[in-house]
């Protein structure tokens, strides 16, 4: 049974304020994960302490990396059941895990940070792990060339 929305709204906002788009239905998940060719982070949010104390702050810090994913989306385990179930179908070879962070590239899963890799770890350790995945799988966005002075 899903939690009351007023209880989890602040947990949702932790990611939304970072630029994450919430996916609340299976169709929304398919619209993004089924067609997106850019690098995409999928945060599997949850109410547990390791999400609040590790995953969400770790993700926030990781986004300060120079190289980062192009698209940020989230599903909320235990709340948006249909969306979470559909997202997990894209994570071939991994059992359901929440919280978790998946990195997709060209529609394929290239990295997965599971709950057992989040529990008991400091957010900065989680951020470093995610940054390493971004550095390996994401592209640097070239800066615009400087225009000559007029």
Kindly give the residue locations of the regions a language model identified.
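Non-catalytic, surface beta->alpha helical segment in thiol-disulfide oxidoreductase systems
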Residues: 94-142
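Short, well-ordered amphipathic alpha-helices
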Residues: 58-60, 88, 134
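N-terminal leader/targeting and pre-domain segments
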Residues: 1-37, 138-141, 145-149
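Conserved strand-to-helix beginnings and helix N-cap segments that scaffold or border functional pockets
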Residues: 52-57, 84-85, 123-124
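Local sequence-structure signature of Cys/Sec-based thiol-disulfide redox active-site neighborhoods
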Residues: 31-66
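Short acidic (Asp/Glu) patches
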Residues: 84-97
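Thiol-based oxidoreductase modules, predominantly thioredoxin-like and allied folds used
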Residues: 23, 44, 67-86
């Amino acid at each position: 049974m899903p939690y009351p929305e007023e209880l989890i709204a602040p947990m949702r906002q932790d990611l939304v304020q970072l630029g994450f788009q919430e996916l609340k239905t299976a169709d929304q998940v398919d619209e993004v994960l089924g067609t997106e060719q850019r690098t995409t982070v999928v945060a599997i949010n949850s109410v547990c302490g390791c999400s609040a104390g590790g995953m969400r702050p770790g993700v926030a810090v990781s986004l300060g990396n120079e190289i980062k994913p192009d698209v940020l989306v989230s599903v909320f385990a235990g709340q948006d059941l249909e969306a979470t179930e559909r997202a997990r179908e894209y994570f071939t070879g991994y059992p359901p895990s929440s919280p978790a962070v998946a990195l997709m590239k060209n529609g394929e899963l290239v990295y997965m940070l599971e709950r057992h890799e989040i529990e008991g770890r400091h957010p900065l350790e989680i951020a470093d792990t995610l940054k390493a995945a971004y550095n390996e799988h994401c592209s640097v966005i070239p800066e615009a060339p400087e225009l000559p002075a007029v």
